[in-house]
Amino acid sequence: MGKIIGIDLGTTNSCVAVLDGDTPRILENAEGERTTASVIAYTDGETLVGQPAKRQAITNPQNTLFAIKRLIGRRFEDEEVQRDIEIMPYKIIKADNGDAWVEAKGQKMAAPQVSAEILKKMKKTAEDFLGEEVTGAVVTVPAYFNDAQRQATKDAGRIAGLDVKRIINEPTAAALAYGLDKKGGDRTIAVYDLGGGTFDISIIEIDNVDGEQTFEVLATNGDTHLGGEDFDNRLINFLVDEFKKEQGFDLKNDPLAMQRVKEAAEKAKIELSSAQQTDVNLPYVTADATGPKHMNIKVTRAKLESLVEDLVVRTLEPLKVALADADLTIDGITDVILVGGQTRMPMVQAKVAEFFGKEARRDVNPDEAVAMGAAVQGGVLAGDVKDVLLLDVTPLSFGIETMGGVMTKLIEKNTTIPTKADQTFSTAEDNQSAVTIHVLQGERKQASYNKSLGQFNLEGIQAAPRGMPQIEVTFDLDADGILNVSAKDKSTGKEQKITIQASGGLTDEEIEAMVQEAEANKDADKKFEELVTARNQADQMIHGTKKQIEEAGDDLPTDEKEKIEAAITALEGVKSGDDKEAIDAKTQELMQAAQKLMEIAQQKAQAQQGAQAGEQPKQEDDVVDAEFEEVK
């Protein structure tokens, strides 16, 4: 089995790691960075990912997509999506199936399709390091992701050409990275994960029994729409409001200006983690009839904290719930680990320390721990890591809708996965010949307040008084936290099974079409790369030949010179075009035309070498070799 890589597919940044021996190693991308910005830009004929995409965002805001993870597995009508529509510079649209999609360069795309571009870059980074093709991956998701979001993440992997061997929760992955080298006594750790777009808290018990380490998740909680992007947006809104007060101009109507403000706000937020004050200085941020407008606003750490305090406080309630679900008090927590870039904010660190009554550990890299843990799990699945057992849980309860619009739970939240549960139900009316199984995920008693995962019918039930037929419903939850459901009429043996796919989500046909499109683009990308290489070779050939013509001077016969210059002109005429074969052919013609030039250059070089050899001083005949004695 080949290497199974670990990928942290983040809202703001993504990261890839691989097991190197028995140690997880973070891999640098083509730009030499250990993390890759989760930004995708569509330009004329090219798709940019990471820093190159981020760099051109100011001039191309409508076609530069970021924070796509906030849309993955989401419905367009979701409250969180509607909030994002108001603040995102790019277009969020409603797909035919009701999902939240995006539009760039006139093309409509599903969130998994866009996320696949990031996964492709992670895959390529790993392949460049390993020198071989990579197909297997462990991909992390927020612990509080629901079934639809997990399924959509797997779909993204498939579109990127990856076989996602396992989906694991981000806090669990961080615990794996932290605990792998910690031998000794048992510990219970709290992983507080505040990333770019999501927040999770997991309580994890690490046991050492006879040399085997068991990582058991006791409870998890969180908010899949709370993260660094929300902190950024608070600061962006403050800057825009201040500018409006000073200049009487609303920047929200200017996408280019808003992109500059967004970048400046991100930078200011990061600076305020180490400084008490920073200046947001944007000359020529916009202009009107009176002339150019400049932004120059001082922001203090205290001001930023006042803008986001309620967001930080919002993370504390899930901590209380997770502790209660784990049947623990704060005294039972051995260590606190902070994961996610937003945990670098001093206020976040202070609030967490205040809650747990202890400082968080400083020996975990908040940006890299999750990918490292995913690589460890990849090693476990590949059989490279022994004596490590991971027991994760489902973050939310699963059930079905029963009479009166009630949700009846079959699998409770925080149940260790994989797991299986069944329950027998009956009909609500006399002589009922079919039942609809409506599958739900959530904690509310009223079915309509929970997430609908889909529904199916079991037909052909024998006529009988209500309450007599016995219908066995089985829920089978796999290690990725994805659900399979079956319903069986015990009297007839008739059975109906489905793998839960939310009422939205991508069909197998749609995923396959996207895989084919990705493959087609792969060929197009390869051809583009080959074209650029041919152009570069042509440029080098032209430059080198012109230089040799100068150096040859009068030694080059006029007719030869004219022949070479004609070949140069011919190559210059095609090198900027898109016909690689034409560029290669004209490059070859120039090489042949310049044959005489090569000969002259070679003759000159040989003559020069001969002259240098002739100038070397002759050894004098009367020089006597001295004898010497080694003194020991």
UniProtKB/Swiss-Prot annotation:
**Low complexity compositional bias: what residue ranges?**
601-616
What is known about its induction?
Answer: By stress conditions e.g. heat shock.
Q: Which InterPro entries match?
A: ATPase_NBD (IPR043129), Chaperone_DnaK (IPR012725), Heat_shock_70_CS (IPR018181), HSP70_C_sf (IPR029048), HSP70_peptide-bd_sf (IPR029047), Hsp_70_fam (IPR013126)
Keywords from the named record: ATP-binding, Chaperone, Nucleotide-binding, Phosphoprotein, Stress response
Q: Where are the transmembrane segments?
A: none
Renumbered to this chain, region (Disordered) spans 601-632
Q: Which residues carry this modification: Phosphothreonine?
A: 198
**So which domain of life are we looking at?**
Bacteria
Quote the biased-composition stretches of kind Acidic residues, using this chain's numbering: 622-632
GO MF terms held by the record: ATP binding; ATP-dependent protein folding chaperone; unfolded protein binding
This molecule's function is given as: Acts as a chaperone.
* UniProt record similarity statement: Belongs to the heat shock protein 70 family.
Q: What is this protein called?
A: Chaperone protein DnaK 1
To which species is this protein native? Aliivibrio fischeri (strain ATCC 700601 / ES114)
